[in-house]
Amino acid sequence: MALNSMQEIFEKAASRSIPFWRVVLETDMEERQVTEEQSMEKMRAAWHAMLESAVSYQGDQRSRSGLVGGDGARMRRYAAADTTYSGPYVQEVIATALSVGESNACMRKIVAAPTAGACGVLPAVLVPLYQMGRATEEEILQALYTASGIGAVVSFRACIAGASGGCQAEIGTASAMAAGALTSLRGGDPQQIGHAAAMALKNLMGLVCDPVAGLVEVPCVKRNVVGSVNAVSCADMALAGVESRIPVDEVIDCMGEVGRRMPMEMRETALAGPAATPTGKAVKERM
């Protein structure tokens, strides 16, 4: 998608008095030469697949390595006891992030948003709102266009792959996309969307990609939780009027620079971090 900067989206939205999400929608229509209805239907299909990835979770399923599975169900059982620190929405955000991340590790269908390793973040923040009746499907679709626009800009200006820029490029980008989507859902203006995305990305900048045994399981699944809850907090800050002191495009650019400076061992090679611990090495040998 030819969106080179968040500033470009801001200017297009301001010049025509349209929301952020509509700029992204119209860009998709122009690029793919499709109607608004056709673009919406493709996004609706992605949303339905995302929703299915959350609701079809099987708590008794385990990944082939045995490292992942069941934690989404554990979180829901714990939440049912009404002893959590977080409220009902955040409880379900955590459980959904775990569930979708585990489903990916168990080879079930997910939506890469922007990658499979970060597949739990967007559904974690959006599916509970939809299930609680706090957002309609049409509002969710609009929020997904907002998320897509942010992801497109990050992909153009930096990177979205752990092998290129570490986990900051995957979970960090997903968190920025989710923060922007949530801000959009509550009527945030383009500038607030930008602040939410910038804060979310800054909070996870420098995060390395260090999968145990090279599998998208440990620590990947639980990092989806961090990305999701980070997105919620950044959306609330932006909607409250809290601003990122560094403009969002500059934050994206420096994330790309941090990724390029990151040692090879910390970019999805499983040669550092938890992957290089005695336990991590033992898992690799066993596999």
Report residues per predicted region:
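A structural-propensity feature for long, helix-poor, extended segments
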Residues: 145-181, 203-230
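Conserved phosphate/anionic-ligand binding catalytic regions in large, soluble enzymes, centered on
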Residues: 107-125, 169-174
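Helix-rich "cap/lid" substructures immediately adjacent to catalytic or cofactor-binding pockets
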Residues: 90-105, 128-157
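Generic N-terminal targeting/processing segments that precede catalytic cores or assembly contacts
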Residues: 1-108, 131-132, 241, 248-287
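Glycine- and small hydrophobic-enriched segments that form the cores of compact globular domains
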Residues: 85, 112-119, 131, 153
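Alpha-helix capping and helix-loop boundary segments enriched in small/acidic/polar residues
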Residues: 84, 113-116, 138, 162-170, ...
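Functionally critical mobile loop/hinge segments
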Residues: 184-287
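Alpha-helical support elements that line or immediately flank enzyme active sites
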Residues: 123-134, 179-187
